[in-house]
């Protein structure tokens, strides 16, 4: 037997926490047990006779494993199995790349007047048929409307697609969900009535750019110059209709103090309504320290301002939880078992013009296109798409082999590696940052 390479131990006030990032198991150790584990690290088999109960707990939790276990290969296989999950499909549709707001941080190129054509709508509906036909193990079908501002084309695109989606999936043993990422300004009662009639679990993501005038100045619109209060009211209206809402708050070092003030807007909601809020604070990428490559990380330091901003975000997360809200930081710590929805093999993003993409966090242009939607509803993917998804992370990100977070990080994002084309680390190669991530994982684990 041997100790797992993915064991992490750290002290706390009353003792030590032992956590394994592969099995996601944790143990509380007093000082005596922590010392015993350290002393017997290289001869762990001897511990079975000295302290059999402790040894059994270590084996049961995956802290001690058989000598022939290749843990790195096990993580690679776990990641591949997650991405190849045949029981779910994630289909994203961009009805338009036009938008009724002008946000300074937006990475997309607005295409004024763009709209999915009737023929592309028909091809998209045929794609839904194709997905249902070719995926006999399908148990969860997730449909997303993105953009641009998708509600600009509610009648022209969303209604016919969603109506067809509802009709084609009704009566099947499939969990169906719809999520609409919107700026929220165009929501009205007629739309909400339509979504309820579809009989499909529907959720919204609505974004704020600060509190009050900070939001209004950042989110420019001639039609909606005072959009902050409009969005607050629309979120509350959705909650009253028993619809879940992801309240995403984009913040910078200048307005991080707004986070809690925005949450306070929902204190007057009833407890059941607050339970339907998923709070997601996101630091705007132009404001954050985004260095992830080794070369870049060697040339930066995390300054005091960054630490203060992070602390304010963490404080707001705790406050949201105290109000009974759900909390979902934008970067899932465990992206192996819970990958980005666009990383799955069974995932596609259909642009208004029929171009097909994987990642929705990059511009929808020719350089990033991964395929084309054909008229019969099938997708003609680039030949190397699956080889890039399934490529072993340790083949090109060699630092992952020695990293305690590999079982939860999985070597990072395919798109990010494509952007940098060199070794990188989501935690900036910083061991303290990695340990903090472990502590967050432990906080999510029942001790």
What residues fall within each predicted segment?
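Short glycine-enriched, charge-decorated loop/helix-capping segments at active-site entrances
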Residues: 109-113, 217-225, 419
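Short, acidic, Ser/Thr-enriched surface-loop or helix-capping motifs
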Residues: 21, 350-351
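Short cysteine clusters
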Residues: 99, 103-106, 340, 354, ...
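Conserved alpha-helical substructure of the radical SAM core
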Residues: 73-193, 198-202
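N-terminal [4Fe-4S]-dependent radical SAM core
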Residues: 3-28, 52-92, 136
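Radical SAM enzyme core and accessory elements
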Residues: 1-54, 374, 395-447
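Radical SAM enzyme [4Fe-4S]-AdoMet core and its adjacent flexible, acidic
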Residues: 213, 217-232, 236-343, 353
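C-terminal accessory region of radical SAM enzymes
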Residues: 300-335, 361-410
